[in-house]
């Protein structure tokens, strides 16, 4: 099944487009929130509801770990049955080209996670030596 990778407002549109170029050759697609009907100004709960309303298989990418701490957002994420990865804080301090190359480098690990039953949230660290770790959702 074709996977759609959703990048929220806590990620750069350039990151979504760059990773999207790689994903396209695998038969997948990347979308930044600015390009979806819900729009760039949608709240986290609004975009979660939008993704759940489609028949697509989504993997969300965010730089905002608060999804797991905010009760309403956590409940909406679970209700929507979403799969997600959180980029560790170090991503925010890293140039876009390195963010993209690191996500692409780790893509086989990330794609393996998509086979797990939703909902789930994993943190992807910025270091090669660190493993991807599951976050409570």
What are these regions (language model features)?
Residues 80-114:
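Ser/Thr/Gly-rich flexible loops in soluble cytosolic domains mediating phosphotransfer, phosphorylation
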């Amino acid at each position: 099944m074709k996977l759609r990778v959703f990048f929220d407002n806590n990620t750069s549109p350039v990151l979504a487009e760059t990773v999207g170029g790689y994903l396209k050759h695998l038969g997948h697609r990347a979308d930044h929130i600015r390009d979806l009907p819900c729009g760039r100004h949608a709240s986290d709960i609004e975009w979660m509801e939008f993704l759940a309303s489609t028949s697509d298989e989504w993997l969300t990418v965010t730089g905002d770990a608060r999804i797991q701490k905010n009760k309403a957002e956590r409940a909406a994420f679970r209700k929507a049955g979403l799969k997600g990865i959180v980029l560790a804080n170090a991503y925010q301090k890293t140039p876009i080209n390195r963010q993209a190359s690191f996500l692409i480098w780790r893509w086989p690990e990330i794609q393996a996670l998509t086979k797990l039953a939703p909902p789930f949230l994993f943190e992807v660290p910025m270091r090669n030596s660190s493993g991807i770790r599951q976050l409570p959702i």
